[in-house]
Amino acid sequence: MRLRLPVVCFLWEIAMIVLFGIFVRYNDEADPHWSEFMKAQNITSDIQNDYYFRYPSFQDVHVMIFVGFGFLMTFLKRYGFGSVAFNFLLAAFGIQWAILMQGWFHTFKNGKILIGVESLINADFCVGSVCIAFGAILGKVSPVQIMVMTLFQVTLFAVNEWILLNLLHVNDAGGSMTIHTFGAYFGLTVAWILNRPRLKQTNDKEGSVYVSDLFSMIGTLFLWMFWPSFNSAVSYHGDAQHRAAINTYCSLAACVLTTVAISSVVNKKGKLEMVHIQNATLAGGVAVGTAAEMMLTPYGSLIVGFICGIVSTLGFTYCSPFLSNKLRLHDTCGIHNLHAMPGLIGGIVGAVTAACATEAVYTADGLKKMFRFEGDYATRTPSMQGGYQAAGLCVSLAFGLVGGTVVGCILKLPIWGDPSDENCFDDEVYWELPEEDEEEHLGAANQYVTHLPENFKLPDRTEVAFK
């Protein structure tokens, strides 16, 4: 790694500098000519600059990508550094490449890519799909493999997004299809290609401890709190953005209760499992993404969250072991249960909600604005839109599976320096760890134990820690 990682980071960052220098420029709202643009567009105040509408949402989304996803993956007892820092690395590189790729497809004008605050949000969305895929292979790949995967996945994401939004003309405000379905099935396919048959027999480091689960819960709470911003960040100003935040809020709240209920039901002693609370409580935000700005209604959002809490929790209990034991698909973070299945549900909910849209509910102008029934799409009806939404879900699924297969085969090449089975899920391979005087800690623990009453019984977790 001493040679591979520095070379990849230096060369790719130099490439980003060159490409940004050639192609990337500020858009009208970030350019010094903003005052002239204001006059041309009859804009009377600087407060109407898109920055003031989008930046609060951008802040929330940015925190989700770097803090939320990063800390959510710190549950592994010996891979905390890698979880947070490698997520940081892939996201920092990914947003640069995403600005270029998405810019070439969406904001390329007169030979230049014009970027503003919405470009930053969309780049974060793109990187979000990579963070999701990273969860499936967490602890089993090298940093160089992570960078290579990011390069290819961002490219495929941009192509898939362009097909859905520009060719099929679908709505996907919160990215149930473009972000979650694509990212999850891409990551799962890569994990399947990179399967390690002897991993369970040769490595016992995959697992959590009390403190690592607590750190992971920090990521959960950041994601849960900011998900309404995630799903509404790029919606139209006004009622659509407002509605997206409300629908997400309701779905997330319902999801928590059903997750807790099912977690207790499936446990033989009726106890709760932290892996369910860390992950399944977020499934409602995933599933409401596509239909977030549609007239899903508050009670409809509660129903979506209710269903996803059940599906995701049962997935962690039954699907994950099945995938690992029968299909040789080892999913470290359980993204199949948090992103893949809820993403499919979200795509279906979006298709049905779009197909059921009427002028009586949206008004004639509202219906045209919601689904952009204008220009080449002026003759499209809600039922047709529902069909295209379903087609978009299939395209995202296909891109994830086929793209994941190709990229997985590339990552399987020995030139990337992947870790051995024995070194998986262990920070020591890639990080200088702080030295600890184990004898001093054990001595202090033993001294504490000798002063306890003879009939004192230590809690189970403490006994395990002392052992």
Curated annotation (Swiss-Prot):
Compartments where found: Apical cell membrane
Positions in the Extracellular compartment: 25-55, 102-119, 169-173, 235-245, 293-295, 359-390
Highest rank taxon of the organism: Eukaryota
Keywords: Ammonia transport, Cell membrane, Glycoprotein, Membrane, Transmembrane, Transmembrane helix, Transport
Role description: Functions as an ammonia transporter.
Protein name: Ammonium transporter Rh type C
Organism: Xenopus tropicalis
Self-association and partners: Homotrimer.
Leader peptide range in chain numbering: none
InterPro entries: Ammonium/urea_transptr, NH4_transpt_AmtB-like_dom, RhesusRHD
